[in-house]
Amino acid sequence: MKLGNLVKDHWIDGDGDGTVLTSAVSGSPVASITSKGLDFADMLQHARTVGGSNLRRYTFHERALMLKALAQCLMEHKVELYELSTQTGATRQDSWIDIDGGISTLFVFSSKGRREMPNSHVYLDGPPEALSRTGTFVGQHICTPKLGVAIHINAFNFPCWGMLEKLAPALLAGVPAIVKPASSTAYLTELMVRRILASGILPKGALQLICGSVGDLFDHLDCQDTVAFTGSKATAEFLQQHPRVIAESVAFTAETDSLNSSILGPDAVPGTPEFELFVKEVTREMTSKAGQKCTAIRRIIAPASLASELVSALSESLGKVRIGNPAMKDVDMGALASQGQREEVGDRVKLLSREADIV
């Protein structure tokens, strides 16, 4: 199966055979992916002229209700999304974070849009400001939708939630989106987008999808566009230095290379609730999504006096984790998202083992 690209409200296959995507569990082919031959400039123009115009016709409340309807629609397709999610190496609990978590984000933004935003096309940013003594000169800040496109470049670890957490605020703001999922798990994103398009809830041009390379997309950005990137620091810096991004002052936000830590206090000795909680949470974060969450604990800091006992407790806790096919109910941790991720983790373990012992 070749993944489709959603271009100007139609599914388009990229040219050529594309790159084969394999199951994280079995290694068997799941789909092929390519975006060769797409007219990225035309996609941007369609989003600006058709998608943006259509979205701006609605009020904040009306767009918020779209998000609610979209969430309700996706709830009806959870079974097939969960089934396909296992191919990414995700257990049912992992998929719950990704799929149900993403859908919940739609509900949250829908609720906030109706509670915190006006039922109008303009958002007033604060009260009027008197700029003269007599009150004849008054200023008022307002917020209106940008006239560009929201470019969303997403990571491999959350193919559903990663898309929906960015898509929800963009649509609520009245800005169309072009989504580029990470290739290794793009087949799950593509399925969700297919269900979104089929629902007919979003107006034409509001959402487009690129499965594969973004090609020369960045060459056609302008000052009204925004880029939201999730991935490595190196890639983010490379994209931020694109001549067009600099020349047009394109708004660019990036979430990169999370290095979250958990610190054990010197008074949290073995036998205390704090010590047990520390071990429990470190184990959870090391095994949830096979340790691939952006919020995973990657640095464990503890007093030297407690290090030996902590290592023993963590070894015992991790030894109970059942690793295997995530489709099996008795499995606690599935596979890494791709063979490439497996190789990278292996390389990093070898690097760390030069200075540290493998527990």
What are these model-derived regions, one by one?
Residues Y82-L84, D94, E116-V122, G205, ...:
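Short, hydrophobic secondary-structure boundary micro-motifs
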Residues A198-G200, D225-T226, T235-V359:
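ALDH superfamily catalytic-core signature
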